[in-house]
């Protein structure tokens, strides 16, 4: 069963619980700064593991000391769904362990 798109109000309510996340071009987005390129790469691997577990994948970008994510649900016509919010929450939970801010 495809995920249902969240309404604009629901997206705003979910974003209020996800500090640092925003809506950009219809996708949930967040950038993290880390202490080193190695720490950023380790976080990318950890995020990839979570994405595989959830069977939901973001656009994930590794920079010099940064990691950036952008996510929406393709099966919902590119809308934001609870799947995106769950991925964002899981990434937030693991980010601190990598020293991300």
UniProtKB/Swiss-Prot annotation:
Record's catalysed reaction(s): (4aS,6R)-4a-hydroxy-L-erythro-5,6,7,8-tetrahydrobiopterin = (6R)-L-erythro-6,7-dihydrobiopterin + H2O
GO biological process, any: tetrahydrobiopterin biosynthetic process
Keywords: Lyase
Enzyme class: lyase
Keyword Chaperone: no
EC number, as in UniProt: 4.2.1.96
UniProt-listed InterPro entries: PCD_sf, Pterin_deHydtase
Entry similarity comment: Belongs to the pterin-4-alpha-carbinolamine dehydratase family.
Protein name: Putative pterin-4-alpha-carbinolamine dehydratase
